[in-house]
Amino acid sequence: MEFEKVNESKLPKEITSDIIPEYRSLERALACSVNDDIYVIVTRGEKPTSGYKVSVDSMVIEKKDEKETLIVYADFKDPDKKTAFSQIITYPVNVVKTDLKRLPDDIELRIQY
């Protein structure tokens, strides 16, 4: 499946204003349709410092019993324990635009560290 990371400044307003604020405190993957494009959003939840990262590594569709499940493989990076980071609450998020034509029936997040 093809996808591309979307720079935060180029995200549709629906994603930045509605979806990310609602889900940023959770650790999950979700998909949404905006202007006929399907986006996948991976959130890491609330973190106590800067330095936490999330990125989408790959995605596949699994079909079972007439249901399509989007499996999202995400890389989570934690800050180096030997490095000082800002003591500020952060919400790591990664948004990618996919080549999907419709929303999947379900989404499963598989995390890799």
How would you name each of these model-derived features?
Residues 1-113:
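Exposed, flexible binding/inhibitory loops of compact, secreted disulfide-stabilized domains
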